[in-house]
Amino acid sequence: MPTRTSRRTFVKGLAASSILSGLGLWRSPAWALPNPGQPDGLSGTEFDLTIGETQVNITGNARTAMTINGGIPGPLLRWREGDTVTLRVKNRLDETTSIHWHGIILPANMDGVPGLSFDGIAPDGMYVYRFKVRQHGTYWYHSHSGFQEQSGVYGPLVIDAKEPEPFTYEREHVVMLTDWADEDPARVMKKLKKQSDYYNNNKRTVGDFINDVGEKGWSATTAERWMWAQMKMNPTDLADVSGATYTYLMNGQAPNMNWTGLFKPGEQIRLRFINGSSMTYFDVRIPGLKMTVVASDGLHIKPVVVDELRIAVAETFDVIVEPADGAYTLFAQSMDRTGFARGTLTSRPGMQAEVPPLDPRPLLSMDDMGMAGMDHGSMNHSAKPAMDGMDHSKMDHDSMPGMDHGTMPMQEAPVMQSHPDSERNNPLVDMQAMSTSAKLNDPGIGLRDNGRKVLTYADLRSTFEDPDGREPSRTIELHLTGHMEKFAWSFDGVKFSDAKPLMLKYGERVRIVLVNDTMMTHPIHLHGMWSDLEDENGQFMVRKHTIDMPPGSRRSYRVTADALGRWAYHCHMLYHMEMGMFREVRVEE
């Protein structure tokens, strides 16, 4: 049985922390506190987890959160590759709950998705998860029920490898990045449905217009503003939910709490970064230190030395750093630059380094969205296909939605993009990318030409060859679609409640091509099976469980349907998933 670790009795809020100290509103997990060795947590093969309500204070305001074993995040679980683990999850909420083991390969009935894997865990009920651990690395776990993940039901997961890893380190720290809102998540959703840019406090001003006229001229500025107005979109709307309501947390602690990880000078330190947020992409750097990226989504990659990395929602990255004596700031700013999570690596308790300012606010361009050079004056905002002259009659978007192009990989250069018939005159689709590319070498909006070496997907190369080796027998193309004004999200313009399952035959190897027709980024996660990302020429690059899809991108990956059952396939932006960007993948004999 695992040993319970001691917990801090209180976490101070952003404001009025000195006044509130001693109230005992909640407990911070011991693994999230500074310690001289490996992080504490629950380890072994048998675990007891309880999901319930806990009073917390993160921002200076007392709120009721949903927690696992009383903490945010939940306990760090440590498994060992090759073991069989048993996890007894008890529900002390007044609603059904669940736990999904993100990125873990396991039987379908252990995956933890109500309605697909099982019925969920009823109030006062318990579910016993039991499965063999077939992998190693950095992962996480979270509720797959409603908005419970946003309310605090998540935690980190580390699986120790049974064989020596291809790098060394003397110490490790888990760094879990999340977003917290004092608001009820249902209220957040209600606001987004009424006004999709409700939380965008970075809208352009008259002053911005005057500055742009000075730089670009009157004609170019007014034309650009007119195009955005025609699309009923805003180039500053990079995140549906922003720092206007979110506080960004590092290991459950707000920026002013300064989570601290200790080290001895000259040690090699492994940092296990986990983005367990509901809606936030983070750009992570440690001023004064290079990071050697050694793993992505739990699996080893060929080492890449960078200054900064963007971590999509649900992704994980492992890096090695080697700090000298002193203090270093762990700085994770939100992609829209409305806030940051922050911590410190230090050789002595109490030390801290300067916190850098937020980078300038980035703006989306037409090129970002695959719309460069297009005439928006004739744009039909009922989403009439951008290429009306093409014959789409042969597209099959029913039992296997998507265009089937055999084994054709993505093209290296931008291509004129066709679209499925289901997007035609669709009230749930307000935009279509017209010229798409893989964008594997692109650091992403807000990170280009910033003077720092930024990790890109092109840098990610697994330390192993394609584990399957077969060419895909067919290609499934799916479009990520949405309507910004209505805050509606879908695949191919078809929301989950109206969509048929994607049917895969057990054992087949397929290529999935994703096209992002929206102005938002989408991290796409397939449960139960690995996603083997390809380069522009269809060659295997890296094995992942979550694929980041920037606006206007077209990316492909291979999937081996080696897991029977019903599996979730969805955008991991929680509010996008809840609003329809979700499919069932069914693997049958």
UniProtKB/Swiss-Prot annotation:
The keyword Oxidoreductase applies. Residues 1-32 form the signal peptide. Its main location: periplasm. It comes from the Bacteria. Cu cation 1 binds at H100, H525. Keywords: Copper, Metal-binding, Oxidoreductase, Periplasm, Repeat, Signal. Residues 367-403 are annotated as: 2 X 8 AA tandem repeats of D-H-X-X-M-X-G-M. Cu cation 2 binds at H102, H142, H572. Cu cation 3 binds at H144, H527, H570. It is found in: Periplasm. GO terms for molecular function: copper ion binding; oxidoreductase activity. Predicted to be exported by the Tat system. The position of the signal peptide cleavage has not been experimentally proven. One of its GO terms (cellular component) is periplasmic space. InterPro entries: Cu-oxidase-like_N, Cu-oxidase_2nd, Cu-oxidase_C, Cu-oxidase_fam, Cu-R_CopA, Cu_oxidase_CS, Cu_oxidase_Cu_BS, Cupredoxin. Disulfide bonds: none annotated. It holds the Pfam family Cu-oxidase_3. Cu cation 4 binds at H522, C571, H576, M581. Sequence repeats lie at residues 367-374, 396-403. The keyword Signal applies. Could be involved in copper resistance. May have oxidase activity. Belongs to the multicopper oxidase family. CopA subfamily. This is Copper resistance protein A homolog. It comes from Pseudomonas syringae pv. tomato (strain ATCC BAA-871 / DC3000).
